[in-house]
A protein has these predicted regions:
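Well-ordered alpha-helical scaffold segments within catalytic/enzyme domains
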Residues: 1-6, 37-53, 104-122, 167-177, ...
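Solenoid-like repeat scaffolds
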Residues: 20, 156-159, 188-196, 224-230
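Flexible glycine/proline-rich, aromatic-decorated loop/lid segments
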Residues: 75-89, 179-187, 226-228, 233-247
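Non-catalytic C-terminal accessory modules of carbohydrate-active enzymes
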Residues: 216-354
Length: 354
């Protein structure tokens, strides 16, 4: 979406991952992968707005939710049944009973199902009711006021806090603003909470920090974490990277001295951050506006990049330290620089001194 914007590959991948009905097991047997598939459809819809594809895939979304709803326990929480894998991340978290991070994903799926149902002219009220019930239960059982954070498990009695559920609580806007500030202080900015060691979940954490305006911290993390792999000779980004691990053990994984994937697609998220938050491309597709550009030029000494705008075209940004040049090859763009808003017209160039 922020590099090649190939809607066709996106659609074929979505369909291939889901497979045919009836659904008899989770995608890759992983509970959260099924939920992420649903969220992926929503992400595709945001980027391309393809109603025809949405109508094609909607029945599979409904049946996947029905499959998940059949795997709930007494409080309405989604749990792993026999041969299900509750994964979330390669991390030491308390997975006794229902896992909080999983419920955050599950709640986000109810909201997505409601929104997409309504977009297609269908009744989404049942999904909204399920969302309200689930989020109320999450607050009741998983929020720990003393710790100012969500705990992994309420059944074990350990009150263990990891980053994952708390990141999802902010990312999916499940926690209110007051709780989000507590999470920022007590979890995300707390070095006593174990750091994330996969590029995969670093994506979610950095996305949250970007949304909270912490761009300097995110840029520092990109330079230190992904840059740390480059310093060790990486030419592609890895499945997992823990800077504290000795160099001679960096390729260890799955009990194999060379078991780690050194070219893993889930590690490509700097492309997303740099394009969305630093170059500032936001695909909105509403009220006659296709995209908005809010470039954060204070983070660049110079810049020259071409970004895709859905399937509609591209936009080029060139910056020499004084003059920003924007060349639009897509309809319906707006350049926002502080309070100033400048219309971007396909085939025309805008030059602004900053």
């Amino acid at each position: 979406r922020y590099l090649m914007a190939d809607a066709d590959i996106d659609q074929r991948t979505i369909l291939a991952l889901r497979g045919n009905d009836p659904m008899t097991k989770h995608i890759n047997t992983i509970v959260d992968y099924s939920l992420l598939w649903l969220l992926g459809v929503d992400y595709h819809n945001e980027g391309y707005g393809d109603r025809e594809f949405l109508e094609l895939v909607y029945p599979k979304m409904v049946s996947l939710m029905e499959f998940c709803n059949g795997r709930r326990e007494e409080h309405g929480f989604l749990i792993g049944k026999e041969k299900d894998w509750v994964y979330i991340d390669w991390a030491d978290m308390d997975k006794d009973g229902p896992l909080c991070a999983e419920q955050m994903l599950y709640a986000a799926c109810f909201r997505v199902m409601a929104e997409i149902s309504e977009q297609l002219g269908k009744d989404g009220s049942a999904y909204r009711q399920d969302y309200e019930k689930l989020t109320a239960s999450i607050e009741k059982f998983f929020w720990d006021e003393e710790k100012g954070a969500y705990i992994d498990s309420f059944t074990s009695g350990k009150r263990n806090v990891t980053r994952h559920a708390n990141i999802f609580a902010i990312l999916f806007d499940i926690a209110d603003k007051q709780k989000q500030e507590k999470i920022l202080k007590n979890v995300l900015e707390n070095d006593e909470i174990p750091a994330i060691t996969t590029p995969y979940f670093n994506f979610f954490e950095l996305d949250v920090l970007c949304q909270m305006g912490k761009l300097t911290e995110v840029l520092d993390k990109i330079r230190s974490y992904w840059g740390g792999m480059l310093d060790l000779g990486a030419v592609t980004f890895w499945e997992e990277y823990d800077p504290s691990v000795p160099k001679e053990e960096q390729y260890d994984m799955y009990g194999d001295h060379f078991g780690k994937s050194l070219c893993h697609a889930w590690a490509a998220s700097p492309i997303y951050f740099l394009a969305k938050y630093f170059a500032g491309l936001d695909l909105v597709n509403k009220d006659g506006v296709t995209y908005v550009l809010k470039p954060q030029m204070q983070y660049f000494t110079d810049l020259d990049c071409i970004l895709p705008v859905g399937s509609d075209g591209t936009v080029r940004l060139a910056w020499d330290g004084e003059c920003l040049e924007v060349i639009a090859d897509a309809e319906g763009g707006v350049l926002e620089l502080g309070e100033e808003k400048i219309s971007l017209v396909r085939g025309e160039t805008r030059r602004v001194k900053i």
